[in-house]
Amino acid sequence: MNVQEIHNIREACITILSGTKHNSVLFEPCDKFDEVINSLDIDPDSKETLRRSVSLLVGTRNHKRGCNIDKKTKDMLNKVYEQKQYLTKEEREFVAKKCNLTPLQVRVWFANKRIRNKNTKM
């Protein structure tokens, strides 16, 4: 790695960290973060190392944060859950449309709900 590449990495870190408040978790997906790193003229291994380093430094992971589901939607999901704790793919898609969520969000919500119920019974 030459001096210019190290300077580019330093600048990338400053750019990424300037978007955080008091070194807190980034609340938006890491798109900006990846965009800056991908624009650097360094080898893929160095990009991945930089991605991990900055991620650890700012407390983020390379995935999107969970979304908050409003009370009305939670109530609807809870009603469905009371009837049936495991949904088929078709049922999951139907519930997702009704709740304005993705089928994946519904699947994860149901999985988390089952775990929460299991833990409260213990």
Swiss-Prot record:
DNA-binding annotation, residue ranges on this chain: 62-121
Gene Ontology cellular component list: nucleus
Subcellular localization: Nucleus
Entry keyword annotation includes Nucleus: yes
Disulphide bond pairs: none
Cited InterPro entries: HD (IPR001356), Homeobox_CS (IPR017970), Homeodomain-like_sf (IPR009057)
Name of the protein in question: Mating-type protein A1
Lineage: Eukaryota, Fungi, Dikarya, Ascomycota, Saccharomycotina
Encoding gene per record: MATA1
